[in-house]
């Protein structure tokens, strides 16, 4: 069973993993059987990180309650999401409660070395706390992250790696953690020889996405992060990537992603205040992981994401090229329709009035499985809503359909169906039919399969998808 290890570096890495987990839940086609996320971020209290960790725990709890066999038709929650590290996080050693100068032990250096360090780093850099990341300073990050290869967590990753497994790296190019972490991690994976299975890892298929600036930060004199420097940092980093990554064939597939329409966020250096709404760019970055997982690369390939039609308006399904629209439309739509049933019509679908409950699902509705399922579908709707209200809006779905469940896809008029039933009466009819066709025996699996069969039939009937 092949695995895809996904390294999410910094806050951007955590946010992209959030979008990718949503796609996994919905059943977007992924080439590998098992996904192993690994987050690299010294800021353990980063709210973007803790939110993603909670989501992945939610997914794993649901997945652990399901036992799929070849006859189960559902695509929801089909892939395994494995945890090999505490909180999925590769811990960076010796950074807790330390400034950068304490980390490098500046006072113990010879005077000539101290003078050199003070030339390379400002006093503000030297006094910078390591607890909340590198605050847009890849020069600091390069020194701190250089020791991850010696960590126990990296050894755990290496010990688990097997022939045929693949690696994908998510990072931003304009910050501190991502900009420094990506080149260092890639070099370690390709050339490192001090860890288990290094020969297999050195020759593994590796892909990465580097995300260019897609947001700005409000001015804050007390913050060390200045978004006006993002572009200059990006230009320098791109030149480095060209000469030291692309040209030496150290990577199999390198994806680039950027947007010139920028949201402006609060300038929070890290911790529990750093929680940003989901963004189109993070959604698209997750599709790069999907693309990489479904392809093989015989030589270095550089890929830049493109949309078919966008103009000045929101991004909808019609903005995607045909292949990507086909990959995303059905699973995301089926899952949003199930989410609406479980969040807005749950009282009915958990009652005896719903015929499918007769001789099925006894005791299920008060279980932790249903609670977990409601939580993740609510999170899915929140995620869609966050992306929709951004300045660069990803407007895939109407999230206020109320009693018109088929008015759900933005820009798509649902087709008429030959039936005396409509709206949620038609949804109920399709679910009642679906439960009779389920191959699953256990209630948890049968419940998920019922919704998948019912929603997939409706999406085909209403949207010809």
Residue ranges and their predicted role:
Residues 1-25, 29-165, 194-465:
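Terminal, contiguous helix-loop blocks that mediate binding/assembly
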Residues 21, 178-190:
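Short Gly/Thr/Asp-enriched flexible loops that form oxyanion-binding sites at enzyme active sites
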Residues 166-170:
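Beta-strand elements within well-structured catalytic alpha/beta cores of enzymes
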